[in-house]
Amino acid sequence: MYCTRKVNDDYTWVGADCRRLALFEGVFGVPDGISFNSYLLTDEMTVLFDTVDSAVRRTFRENLAHALAGRELDYIVVHHMEPDHAAELADMVKDYPRVQILCSAMAKTMVGQFFGPELAGRITAVKEGETLCTGRHTLRFVAAPMVHWPEVMMTYDETDKLLLSADAFGCFGALNGSLFADEMDFDRDFLDEARRYYTNIVGKYGPQVQAVLKKAETLDIEMLLPLHGFVWRQDLAYFLGKYDLWSRYEPEVRGVMIAYASVYGNTENAANVLACRLAEKGVKVKMFDASVTPASYIVSDAFKYSHLVFAATTYNMGIFVTMEQLLLDIAAHQLAERRYALIENGSWSPVSGKKMDALLSPLKGWSAIEAPLTVKSALRPDQEAQIERLADTIAADVAKDPATDTDENGEKHRFVCKVCGYVYEGGTLPEDYKCPLCGAGAEYFREEA
């Protein structure tokens, strides 16, 4: 039996929830399920916006047939060619022989790649700003390349002032009968999953998201209809603001996220001691065991927190495997502008700190707070002062107001250590400053042009 929800008088949600899928895209755990959203506009013409993943095809087809109520389907608008939204295209053409497909030029190429040449005669490529009048409604197409594939576009309904936003503004989690974000406590129940969705699916493409947000500013939007998660009809500024923050890589919390990877518990102990000292100083701390918690959750909180600490055992003269994979994941998502500290452990030749720094230091705007803390097998009582100093340094850095860490013109400068390459960012370089990595004094720093 059908299971649809009305978005408004002319739009109907005809998508489906899936709770059987363990890993979205084969990578990201979705313990609370996920929705595959598809929307039908019934006007003088009928328009379907995207299809769904083949995992929920039966529910989708029943929903679509019910919403059409015997009418023909005139158009399918393809916003995004990923198979979780386009898997049913070929069957739609078989079921509705009059239907025409509208998509971007690059999506048209991808349709051929996924389904062969048979659909070519049904496809019209549309460009930025082109419109389709369906009767009462005028649809305007908006290019959104690399959010998060190159062929992506969105559709703005000028009549109902709603934006069908493809994969932007989505969320992990099944809808559970709800459709609108205002039907539940979104902050409490879904904000973390919305952040995890953004950071892992779209997070790499911050500049492209910023470009879409600038386009959105020119539109009078009263409703957001994404391809995953809830429809937004209230508090749009709140959620658009979150996307603005995330896509600028601005942290939401001034605090410390600590991720560690430990073989026998000694590296974990060092991380716990540091967390305790930081908490005693009033610093907000979040901890993860990289060998237990899937990377997508840690990546999400790396976007959330201003300061990051990574602690790892040396393993086969490298970084312990789960930490190495986590850091590669963070680097792949191009998280920017973070302050970090490292703890390394090794019984005879600890090198994990150097190896971790080699992965993190090239990232845009990343800078080390302090030289790596080295543990030889286990943290010793005579290292208490080192832990305390590291905690003091991190706490002081967290307490800085980033808005005031500028020169008299409100600008930040980058000062590079000529000895080791460490980068200090701020308004001016203090005269008594010493490089946290090599100990070189301020005279060994040069300002980047």
What does each model-identified segment do?
Residues 417-420, 435-438:
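Short cysteine-rich clusters marking metal-coordination/redox-active sites
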Residues 175, 186-224, 228-231, 273-288, ...:
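FMN-binding flavodoxin-like domain, especially the glycine-rich phosphate-binding loop
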Residues 5-9, 103-152, 208-211:
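Metallo-beta-lactamase
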Residues 44, 55-102:
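Active-site metal-binding motif and surrounding structural segment of the metallo-beta-lactamase
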Residues 426-427, 443-447:
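Short, non-ligating residues that shape and space the ligands of small metal-coordination modules
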Residues 426-434:
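Short linker/helix segments within small regulatory modules
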Residues 4-66, 154-157, 161-165, 256, ...:
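Conserved beta-strand hairpin/beta-sheet module of binuclear metal-dependent hydrolase folds
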Residues 265, 413-415, 433:
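Cys/His-enriched microdomains
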